[in-house]
Amino acid sequence: MFFIEHPFVYLGLDLIVGCLIGFFLRKQLVERQQQNIQAQSKQIIENAIIDAEQLKKEALLQSKEEVYQIKQSLEAEVKLERDDLKDEHRQLKKQRDNIKRENERFEKRQSRHVVAEKALERRLREVDVKHEEADNEILKQRDELARIAGITQDEAKKLLMESIESEAQMDAAKRLSKIENEMKLEADRKARSILALAICRYAGDYVADKTVSMVPLPSDEMKGRIIGREGRNIRAIEAATGIDIIIDDTPEAVILSGFNPVRREVARLALIQLISDGRIHPGRIEEVVEKVSKELDEVMCEAGEQATFDVGAHGVHVELIKLLGRLRYRTSYGQNVLQHSLEVAFLCGIMAAELGIDVKMAKRAGLLHDIGKAVDHEVEGSHAVIGRDLAKKYGEPDEIVYAIGAHHADQPPKSVLDILVQAADALSGARPGARKEMLQSYVKRLEDLEAIANKFPGVDKSYAIQAGRDLRIIADAQKISDAEATLLSRNIAASIEEKLTYPGQIRVTVIRETRSVEYAK
């Protein structure tokens, strides 16, 4: 009755039961979630442990790889240092050998000096002995002279002193002559050693220049376009460049002929651009030639700057640099003048280092020694004098200016630097293969050399050898004496200098031989 009369009781019971059921369900859900969370946490921890192990392995591998790379790098550095040490060891050994050789030479010279000193001492002792003998002789002759000729003691002493002084002066003159000859031989040997060292240490590249250039054509039809209507195009090219265009049967090629390398290069580059562009007519030709000329001026300026950089010559006037660049397209007996100037600069530097003088100054003088050849066709005078004036005009030191003017004996050399430039110039120009001549002119020059020698009286035969750098003359011993042979060689050399033009120098050797033949019967 109570429950019926109070329906809220059922509702409360239902709520209590529902709450209990919800509580238990919630509790189970929470427990299940906790289990899931614990399982996930465990899984995360396990995954983290696995990832950590993997990272540890990767880090270990990476560290091993880095250690290996560092080890390889260190081994390479150690090997490089070991090689450097070996090179230094070889250099030191070479220096020790050089020092040892110099010591041996010094000891030999010292021994020669010791021998000479001993000989001098022996000679002095002999002189002392002679003095004593002379004194004794004076004492003996004093009374005899006074008795026979009435000569006083002072007069006798004067006669004897004059005799002894004359003998001593003769001995001293002989000794001085011997020492002078020994010093000349030693100086000659040292000079030859320095020149040989310079030649051995410098090995420059050399490419012979030609007087013709060939321009390839895409087809033979292009020859007609280059010639143009009634030849107006080819005439325009020749007029603008000053180069002869030769179009012959040579397939797909045009030949450019000219002795001015700058103009020939302008013509070659201009023709290549015209062929590539396809527009070939007089107006376009003049435009392209002018453009190429400006570009070539920039190229020559860059060549001059590169030359000064290679030599280490700083502060050279910009006009001199431009003139140096022009030497790139200037040749002398087939030898490129810029390459020759660089070669002379390096040879001067090597020899200057051996002699203990300023290497940079020597290189600078060698580089600029032929600067006059860049404008010798525009200015009157020899290229040495022109170069001297240009160097003075653009602020080069007085030593450089004088060395340039003296390298071809236009003015007498007065310093070691002047002689170095002359020697390096001769080495660069006279070495085999440096300069070339056409076969006809080469043979003609040899014939002219022999003809000049054969014109002199007393010359039996003459032979031009060593590519015309040495003239051997066989003199008639019945007509030429030994003294006249020396005079003959000088006269022939003077005649060659007056009548011929040639690179380098020519040695004239007169050989006089006397033969006596008899038969035993």
Curated annotation (Swiss-Prot):
Membrane topology classification: Single-pass membrane protein
Domain HD: 337-430
Record's keyword annotation contains Ribosomal protein: no
InterPro entries recorded: HD/PDEase_dom (IPR003607), HD_domain (IPR006674), HDIG_dom (IPR006675), KH_dom (IPR004087), KH_dom_type_1 (IPR004088), KH_dom_type_1_sf (IPR036612), Ribonuclease_Y (IPR017705), RNase_Y_N (IPR022711)
Gene Ontology MF: a single term: RNA endonuclease activity
Domain KH: 211-271
GO CC, any one term: plasma membrane
Cellular localisation: Cell membrane
GO biological process: mRNA catabolic process
Keyword set, alphabetical order: Cell membrane, Endonuclease, Hydrolase, Membrane, Nuclease, RNA-binding, Transmembrane, Transmembrane helix
Residue ranges of the TM segments: 1-21
Record family assignment: Belongs to the RNase Y family.
Role this protein plays: Endoribonuclease that initiates mRNA decay.
UniProt-recorded name of the protein: Ribonuclease Y
Organism lineage: Bacteria, Pseudomonadati, Thermodesulfobacteriota, Desulfobulbia, Desulfobulbales
Underlying gene: rny
